[in-house]
Design a protein with these regions (language model features):
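Short, cationic low-complexity segments
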Residues: 285-306, 312-313
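Acidic/polar-rich alpha-helix caps and helix-coil junctions
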Residues: 2-6, 20-67, 93-277, 317-511
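Bacterial N-terminal signal peptides
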Residues: 9-16
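Non-catalytic accessory segments flanking enzyme active sites
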Residues: 83-90, 113
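Conserved oxyanion/phosphate-binding beta-strand-loop segments in alpha/beta enzyme cores
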Residues: 69-82, 103-104, 111
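Residue-level detector of transmembrane insertion/anchoring sites
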Residues: 11, 309-310, 355-358
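Active-site-adjacent substrate-recognition loops and nearby beta-strands
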Residues: 277-285
Length: 511
């Protein structure tokens, strides 16, 4: 990597509409960028943002979602992912390679943040306010990437604009990675625009929402409550009202939706320039028609699924619209997997081209903010506020007005004397049903230290995995270390001489 010339190939996706609903023209933003002459104008700064988003879309692909979903207590793997069943960790070569690609895409996104962060302060054709605003967006994106890196790979090399030309770089402790994440998000909260420039770019509230979420990891509950509360009280977001599971799928996660009132930060997709999302093909079955007419996706591998016998599914109230949004009973191979298998339906794209679907990737929803606020309030003894936030989510899930009290549905603060009672009596179910198939629930389990307990209580209670392994029913499960941290790819050790694979590889992975 040479300091004189550092080239990035930035291909713009259609990020979305502005507030006046005008499209970005991607043909204006295809560059071979030299840092010696670039990052001087708003258009060039925007190209830098789009280049990062393009890599983030690659990082949060089908494997990202599949790998995190199959770790939960209610999802079962098959195909390439079947080797991870039973919580033995990631051992399949193809699966390991895919996780390595996630690692590399996140670092490419970080690199595409670092370069403009080093150059924008010297921009010749922007005001100080414009420079600060674009840098705020880049700090947000870098923080998001490092947050997902540290949660899946643990200690990693900390590459910033200050050391980006240093190739050989040792791993930094998890605490140091979080320190950078917090620092970046504080800069983002200060400098991001008040409103997103385009659908799919961050604003101050995006940064506040992510900062609050990160604070839960750090047990900074007062901070989490304050900043999640700021986002809620801003009035910028609201829950979309729905009356059926199909309504949910169309209005909240619908194919081709430009945006919704609960989008805090999504990665945008477009069929026009093939900036699409392939995860739907991992959950779909090519012959299943969810409304009798449309397939979920034109291509389907159904690499993971759930089962009616799993207690999480078995106890899911059928009046809860999220149930019909998320699952459909479909016995795709009864002789192997039993009669009670269910496909995952949250994302539906009947107009997909093969595995390419125009469904925006919901990294940060308003419901995540409400869940963050509820958890933080309960942690700090404000049970009434915690319950109020959860009740909004639950009311909407049952087709009711989320802002109107509903005695038949509402949780009551008086029922929960402490956090544990609140966790088991309200928060756990609302979080796992609301974030079902969004690659979030496993991190929630890890943050609470509940993975072993929840897996043991649900995964093998009644549902054999697979059907041929009926002797496993009821047996104790040990969650391997490899379920918590993915394997750092070999390329990182081959080219980064500050790392030693025997010393620096994550636990459980052979050299």
């Amino acid at each position: 990597m040479k300091k004189n010339i550092f080239k990035i190939f930035a291909c713009l996706c259609i990020v979305g509409f502005t507030a006046c609903q005008s499209w970005l023209d991607e043909t204006k933003y295809t560059y071979s960028i030299s840092t010696a002459t670039f990052y001087n104008t708003p258009n060039e700064a925007n190209a830098a943002i789009v280049s990062v988003l393009d890599q983030m879309r690659s990082a949060h692909n089908s494997n990202w979602f599949a790998s995190l979903e199959i770790n939960t207590e209610h999802i079962y793997p098959k195909g390439v992912y079947q080797a991870s069943g039973g919580y033995t960790g990631i051992t399949n070569t193809t699966h390991l390679t895919r996780c390595g690609s996630n690692f590399q895409s996140l670092y490419r996104a970080i690199m595409r943040c670092n370069t403009p962060l080093s150059r924008l302060p010297e921009a010749s054709d922007m005001t100080k306010e414009e420079i600060a605003s674009y840098m705020g967006e880049l700090y947000f994106l870098r923080a998001f990437c490092y947050w997902n890196l540290v949660r899946t790979f643990g200690s990693v090399p900390l590459r910033t604009e200050e050391n980006m030309y240093t190739w050989d770089l040792a791993k930094s402790p998890v605490a140091d990675v979080y320190e950078l994440i917090v620092s970046d998000l504080k800069k983002a909260m200060q400098n991001c625009p008040d409103k997103a420039r385009y659908y799919g770019t961050p604003c101050k509230n995006s940064a506040k929402a992510l900062y609050a979420w990160v604070c839960l990891d750090l047990k900074e509950y007062a901070e989490a409550k304050k900043y999640a509360g700021d986002v809620i009280s801003s009035g910028m977001y609201s829950l979309v009202q729905v009356t059926s599971g199909d309504d949910f799928a169309t209005k909240v996660f619908g194919e081709g939706l430009p945006t919704t009132s609960e989008e805090v930060f999504y990665l945008k997709t477009s069929m026009t320039d093939s900036k699409t999302w392939d995860y739907l093909s991992y959950t779909a079955h090519p012959q299943y028609k969810y409304d009798g007419v449309n397939t979920v996706c034109k291509t389907g591998y159904y690499t993971h699924y759930t089962d009616l016998n799993n207690p999480v599914i078995k106890n899911w109230d059928e009046k809860d619209l999220r149930r019909s949004l998320n699952i459909a009973h479909y016995a795709f191979s009864a002789s192997t997997y039993g009669e009670n298998t269910c496909l995952l339906l949250k994302y539906r794209a009947p107009n997909a081209s093969g595995s390419k679907a125009q469904i925006d990737i919901p990294l940060l929803r308003y419901t995540d903010v409400l869940l963050t606020y509820a958890e933080a309030c309960a942690r700090t003894g404000e049970m009434a506020n915690a319950v109020n936030a959860l009740n909004q989510i639950k009311r909407r899930a049952y087709g009711a007005d989320p802002m109107v009290a509903n005695p038949e549905l509402d949780y009551k603060a008086s029922d929960y004397a402490d956090y544990d009672q609140f966790f088991y009596g309200a928060l756990l179910n609302e979080e796992r049903y609301e974030t079902f198939n969004e690659a979030k629930h496993w991190f929630f389990e890890e943050r609470h230290g509940k993975w072993e307990e929840l897996v043991q209580a649900n995964y093998r209670v009644a549902c054999p995995w697979p059907r041929t392994d009926e002797t496993s029913i009821g047996k104790e499960i040990t969650v391997a270390q490899m379920c918590h941290l993915w394997k750092i790819p070999a390329e990182e050790f081959n080219y980064n001489k500050a790392l030693d694979e025997a010393r620096d590889q994550n636990p459980g992975y052979a050299n």
